[in-house]
Amino acid sequence: MKRRLLAAGCAMLLLSGCNAARQQPSPVPPVTQPQAYAEPEDTAANPGSLYSESDSEFLFSDNRARRVGDIVLVKVVETDKAKNKADTTADKTSTNELGVSAFFGQSSASINPINPAGPFSGAVGANPILGTSSTSKHSATGETKRESTVTTTIAARVLRVLPGGLMEVEGARETRVNDETQYIVVSGLVRARDVSSDNSVTSSQMANARIEYYGKGTLADKQKPGWFTRLMDNVWPF
């Protein structure tokens, strides 16, 4: 009796071990609240004065980005369309004939008077000894299309001010939704004169522009084949 109870208990332990453990979702990290700070007291303002300490640097200039560390808004409006089509057709026909009409000054009939129509009696255009012909044809058609559209606005920071009024700017944005992270990176050269009155510039006015838009996560992984498929594509010779 004790052996039966022991066997039944072992069986129950084994069956409970086969049950897959339920995966608990990872806890959401708590949101860190920003620390409050005391704002400095405002100096006594004169209602009848046009001067303000907060706007003192803009008395004789606007708020456009011109110095290192300034922020400029980059309006990315990119619509690219490309289409390429190629057709190739090639035909080649070749005909060769070989015959002997004379040999060391003797005609083919005098070489073999018994059988004037022997194997060496042929002439080009009449009865050639050897005749070959070949025909080659090649036809190919290729077409490629690509279209992309990116529209967004990114705040970029001035990294360097180059001679001639050029500013090197760079900005990035990271957006995370659930388990998917999207990255947008913009960098390039901007002329100070191209910065509009609202402190913005379009991506078409940037030189050496580099715009990257990519993501990491579940959706990005599903958009590409698996590692074994990519491996077979690289090593497959056919």
Swiss-Prot record:
Statement: the UniProt record of this protein carries the keyword Signal: yes
Pfam families listed in its UniProt record: FlgH (PF02107)
Keyword Nucleus (UniProt): no
Alphabetical UniProt keywords: Bacterial flagellum, Cell outer membrane, Lipoprotein, Membrane, Palmitate, Signal
Alphabetical GO biological process terms: bacterial-type flagellum-dependent cell motility
Subcellular location, record wording: Cell outer membrane; Bacterial flagellum basal body
S-diacylglycerol cysteine-type lipidated residues: 18
Chain's role: Assembles around the rod to form the L-ring and probably protects the motor/basal body from shearing forces during rotation.
Domain of life: Bacteria
Topological relation to the membrane, as annotated: Lipid-anchor
Region spans: Disordered: 22-50
Subunit structure: The basal body constitutes a major portion of the flagellar organelle and consists of four rings (L,P,S, and M) mounted on a central rod.
Gene Ontology CC terms, in alphabetical order: bacterial-type flagellum basal body, distal rod, L ring; cell outer membrane
GO MF annotations in UniProt: cytoskeletal motor activity
Entry-linked InterPro entries: Flag_Lring
Signal sequence, renumbered to the chain: 1-17
Protein family according to the UniProt entry: Belongs to the FlgH family.
Covalent lipid adducts (N-palmitoyl cysteine), residues: 18
UniProt protein name: Flagellar L-ring protein
PROSITE patterns, alphabetized: PROKAR_LIPOPROTEIN
